Amino acid sequence: MRAVVQRVTSSSVKVEDNIVGSIGKGLNVLIGISKSDTLEDLKYIRDKVINLRIFQDEKEKMNLSLLDIKGELLVISQFTLYGDCRKGRRPNFMDAKGGEEAKELYEEFLSLLKESNLKVETGEFGADMKVEINNDGPVTIILDSSKNF
């Protein structure tokens, strides 16, 4: 599982010009699910996302987590995080899990996040979405449950 985590002052996502998810201060999280992902991968990324110390404390040091600040989450599925561009000019998405299996894992990931009692908003799985992100910092972290980076 891969996640692109961005610290935001606000973020929203639209489907067909309708806002389907919107948050204030917190994290915008783009999620990619691979063919090999399991529940353990979901838990690993969930724990990293809610516990990353990327919010500033009173000394302006990145020392606080999303849980510490009681921030909000906007989670958006993005299979293109598994695009392989090493050959040719068009990305290959062979490693991305597709269809219903990916949707089930995505929904399980959302359930795990909601256990943290944080506000969790989402996009619409598989839809064409327009995402507005007001980066804070900017601070952007890339996570990979198979620890490739």
From Swiss-Prot:
Keywords: Cytoplasm, Hydrolase, RNA-binding, tRNA-binding. It is an enzyme of class 3 (hydrolase). InterPro entries: Daa-tRNA_deacyls_DTD, DTD-like_sf. GO terms for biological process: D-amino acid catabolic process. It is found in: Cytoplasm. Its EC number is 3.1.1.96. A motif (Gly-cisPro motif, important for rejection of L-amino acids) lies at residues 137-138. The keyword Cytoplasm applies. Its main location: cytoplasm. One of its GO terms (cellular component) is cytoplasm. SUPFAM superfamilies: DTD-like (SSF69500). The keyword Nucleus does not apply. An aminoacyl-tRNA editing enzyme that deacylates mischarged D-aminoacyl-tRNAs. Also deacylates mischarged glycyl-tRNA(Ala), protecting cells against glycine mischarging by AlaRS. Acts via tRNA-based rather than protein-based catalysis; rejects L-amino acids rather than detecting D-amino acids in the active site. By recycling D-aminoacyl-tRNA to D-amino acids and free tRNA molecules, this enzyme counteracts the toxicity associated with the formation of D-aminoacyl-tRNA entities in vivo and helps enforce protein L-homochirality. Homodimer. A Gly-cisPro motif from one monomer fits into the active site of the other monomer to allow specific chiral rejection of L-amino acids. This is D-aminoacyl-tRNA deacylase. It comes from Clostridium botulinum (strain Alaska E43 / Type E3). The gene is dtd.
